[in-house]
């Protein structure tokens, strides 16, 4: 009819179908990316250590936001720590987890425990870590336990010698884990064989793994 307006803005039926197909493709790609991100996150162990609310005084009053300290690991020697800040708690946790994955590092282990005693320090936090015999479990409390569990350490002795602040304890634990070296590295540095520098328990644990 002459006076009737076209609701599709003058587009033909073929153009409308093409646009519908493009929208479905775009939505499918977004769904694929979302599913891929969920799969990647499900592969890791996440632990939220602390959530704090912080406020900022502005002209109109106070603005509140949240910070989250998150530990992420694969349970097989890889672990990282992240700190996220956002206006909502879930967003802060997500940002912390993303930063933790960017900060991944590998922890040298033999038979489910660390390779040698070490002491980590960060600010006022001091954490002592010692290898333990199989079956001991993770003897750790407070904020150090999530770091060790996410790294996949099964047997270890730890003790906090400094501040009880969770952030300091976490970073002191990470500092200690980063100081660990493999027996092969020590042997190469000293110009000796692994059997000459490694304790007997390390050699037994390695033999058990290879068997």
Curated annotation (Swiss-Prot):
Gene3D superfamilies referenced in this protein's UniProt entry, alphabetically: 3.30.160.20, 3.30.230.10
Biological-process GO terms, alphabetical: translation
Superkingdom assignment: Bacteria
Domain (S5 DRBM) ranges: 44-107
Annotated InterPro entries: Ribosomal_Su5_D2-typ_SF, Ribosomal_uS5, Ribosomal_uS5_bac-type, Ribosomal_uS5_C, Ribosomal_uS5_N, Ribosomal_uS5_N_CS, Ribsml_uS5_D2-typ_fold_subgr
Region described as Disordered: 1-41
Keywords on record: Ribonucleoprotein, Ribosomal protein, RNA-binding, rRNA-binding
GO terms, molecular function: rRNA binding; structural constituent of ribosome
GO CC terms of this entry: small ribosomal subunit
Family indicated by similarity: Belongs to the universal ribosomal protein uS5 family.
PANTHER family: MITOCHONDRIAL RIBOSOMAL PROTEIN S5
Notes on the domains: The N-terminal domain interacts with the head of the 30S subunit; the C-terminal domain interacts with the body and contacts protein S4. The interaction surface between S4 and S5 is involved in control of translational fidelity.
Subunit organization: Part of the 30S ribosomal subunit. Contacts proteins S4 and S8.
Role: With S4 and S12 plays an important role in translational accuracy. Located at the back of the 30S subunit body where it stabilizes the conformation of the head with respect to the body.
Protein name, per record: Small ribosomal subunit protein uS5
